[in-house]
């Protein structure tokens, strides 16, 4: 059970890190598409 919790925390952290890293790129791409 502890392994599942640790895996879930690691997955959430990795997804949050990739989201915060890709968010500026996605926002700039959306701005360029709407322009």
Swiss-Prot record:
Its main location: virion. Induction: Expressed in the intermediate phase of the viral replicative cycle. GO terms for cellular component: membrane; viral envelope; virion membrane. Residues 23-35 are virion surface. Unglycosylated because produced in viral factories instead of the classic ER -Golgi route. Keywords: Late protein, Membrane, Transmembrane, Transmembrane helix, Viral envelope protein, Viral penetration into host cytoplasm, Virion, Virus entry into host cell. GO terms for biological process: symbiont entry into host cell. The chain crosses the membrane at residues 2-22. The keyword Ribosomal protein does not apply. It is a single-pass membrane protein. It is found in: Virion membrane. Component of the entry fusion complex (EFC) composed of OPG053, OPG076, OPG086, OPG094, OPG095, OPG099, OPG107, OPG143, OPG104, OPG147 and OPG155. Except for OPG095 and OPG053, each of the EFC proteins is required for assembly or stability of the complex. Belongs to the orthopoxvirus OPG076 family. Component of the entry fusion complex (EFC), which consists of 11 proteins. During cell infection, this complex mediates entry of the virion core into the host cytoplasm by a two-step mechanism consisting of lipid mixing of the viral and cellular membranes and subsequent pore formation. This is Entry-fusion complex protein OPG076. It comes from Vaccinia virus (strain Copenhagen).
